């Protein structure tokens, strides 16, 4: 059953849907989550080839090896979808989301430390890049998919998804230029350290969503 209550209206107005959704703490946390995870996703997709090139890989090798991020990300989306369908207690999909994102934080700190070396270990960096894809894209895929229906239901799914994706695209637009500019001034090691903070905030937002789902289930 959906969390949003639109009253007895069969086709609630857009303003009714918006007010109802914004009044839900879980939905507000989901907006923060969407903004940050789309920002992180965009940094990886736009800038991973440049990052690998800057730390010493050849141009063609950097482009090819950067594919490990979305490739393992596919596995992450399949895993979290299967797991939450079969094992999420009381419909709390956010629990697995914050658990996966907490591992993402560790992966990004590891990339930051490894890329600061004068002789980077490329195999380890690629391992953590792939792991980042798995642990980021899985939770990311939940924001405008399953969680939309869990929160807004069929009546409000379109508006709910539009707002969530809109917030995400703002984060993606910022990432498209900010990460490259930061790397020029601070270096990639510092960029990934900053991104790990964003990942930590994403983890916290998913944790608060999980707490919200648990409280509703117990009510």
What are these regions (language model features)?
Residues 1-30:
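Juxtamembrane intracellular "pre-TM" segments in multi-pass secondary transporters
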Residues 24-81, 140-145, 174-176:
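Extracytoplasmic gate region of multi-pass secondary transporters
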Residues 77-91, 183-184:
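Helix-to-loop junctions at the C-terminal end of transmembrane segments
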Residues 86-102:
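Cytoplasmic membrane-interface "Motif A"-like loop-to-helix N-cap segments
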Residues 102-118:
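C-terminal ends and interior cores of transmembrane alpha-helices
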Residues 121-142, 146:
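Hydrophobic core of transmembrane alpha-helices in multi-pass small-molecule transporters
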Residues 154-185:
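A late C-terminal transmembrane helix in Major Facilitator Superfamily
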Residues 180-199:
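A membrane-interface helix-boundary motif in multi-pass transporters
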